Amino acid sequence: MVVLSTLALVRAAYSLNSFVFEAEDIRFGSPWWFVVVGVACFLVLFAGIMSGLTLGLMSLGLVELEILQQSGSSAEKKQAAAILPVVKKQHQLLVTLLLCNAAAMEALPICLDKIFHPFVAVLLSVTFVLAFGEIIPQAICSRYGLAVGANFLWLVRILMIICYPIAYPIGKVLDAVIGHNDTLFRRAQLKALVSIHSQEAGKGGELTHEETMIISGALDLSQKTAEEAMTPIESTFSLDVNTKLDWETIGKILSRGHSRIPVYLGNPKNIIGLLLVKSLLTVRAETEAPVSSVSIRKIPRVPSDMPLYDILNEFQKGSSHMAAVVKVKDKDKKNNMQLLSNGETPKENMKFYQSSNLTAPLLKHESHDVVVDIDKVPKHVKNRGRNFQQNGTVTRDLPCLLEDNEDAEVIGIITLEDVFEELLQAEIVDETDVYIDVHKRVRVAAAAAAAVSSITRASPAEIQSKVGQTVKKLVGKEARGTKNYTTKITEPLLAESDR
């Protein structure tokens, strides 16, 4: 536009003989003079509409229109639904609007040249086009582009039909060369968009800090791995399969407050299953039965680089809420990286994880009565069986699943709560937790610590009374036998607290 105006000024300078306000073709005040002025005003208005629609419609992306069509107000839904089919023809629409805008701006100086001197005509055309054909329309359409585009959609459709012979071929060429602009947001862009809409950003957003944290955690869930969220095996409370379920062991289980406890054989890294604490309700502590006498359920194994999103999907099936994290072999790591480089989604990667010889896939379509047969050695275990002597009990051909196999050792335990903590990006602390962050060894709040210290300072009679009530609820005994039970369970606890 600036180039055209410059050329017109040069042309006017060469043809200027005298500064006359009125041209000789059409006299001022004649009917034709008013007709030309009306045409000039129409051209300015038409050029302004085309300029505003170019900015308003082309600034509306397909993704934005689809969002408004689904989640906008009733008026926005109607407007977005009407505009979307037209905006999908991006390049044809662009060529149509630019052709009409250029035609109006080129015709304006010609009309004004009939009633004004060429120099005055160029000066007026540049002024009116800038003010009423560019600045004001684009300022309005940049703010109300959706509403303006919907109201002038009938005009746009007519112009697209008129300019079809020229706009359609050029639009197809642009589609082939440039392509369509329908890029979606990346994860980082979505997180930044959510953070901008938070109340803490101070930009009028309605999302609270907790809501933004949860949304960001959900976006990061497929990027985080099991190794990042697991509890290290060294910090995990577990039981040997030959441990006697006496009062001391039951007291430790009660003090931990876990609902599921991993069970190992010989080496704590040799996890063979898990024990549901509620299954101990029928166990009599005076019999000192080993853990192997209770139903030990299968514990699924997942590779350390498995995304938390896939683990959450498997936990949702209800087969298990605890899994053993296994160290991935270098060979399987390379295969996994090759799968990721091929652009496969996390769901497609599940095929790799489930077929890996390091892991046992999470239980599917199995009832909760499935237990581990500790007398049967799995086929994939190289060490068929070994004899262990612990607590005076000798095991018979119990499988050593992962011992002496450094590439497939269990390095941690992951639970559904761990995945939820990564989703919420905050630690979930209950009344039995000792540490908020197991990795950093950060203890719980002072209130919980004070409660623990108050129990430690309590008298033996008070401790026996409290533990007796708990044992009575668990084992279902009458009050007459509670005293003997509490004496047996509190003696080792008191001895340990005196240390």
Swiss-Prot record:
Topological domain spans for side Extracellular: 1-32, 113-114, 167-499
Name of this chain's protein: Putative DUF21 domain-containing protein At1g03270
Keyword terms, alphabetized: CBS domain, Glycoprotein, Membrane, Repeat, Transmembrane, Transmembrane helix
Glycosylation site positions: N181, N357, N391, N484
Cytoplasmic topological intervals: 54-91, 136-145
Domain CNNM transmembrane: 29-211
Gene Ontology biological process terms from the UniProt entry: magnesium ion homeostasis
Domain CBS as annotated: residue spans: 230-291, 295-359, 365-431
Transmembrane segments: 33-53, 92-112, 115-135, 146-166
SUPFAM superfamilies in alphabetical order: CBS-domain pair
Cell compartment(s), UniProt: Membrane
Organism: Arabidopsis thaliana (Mouse-ear cress)
A single Gene Ontology CC term: membrane
A Pfam family it matches: CNNM
CDD domains membership: CBS_pair_CorC_HlyC_assoc (cd04590)
Membrane topology, record value: Multi-pass membrane protein
Keyword presence, Acetylation: no
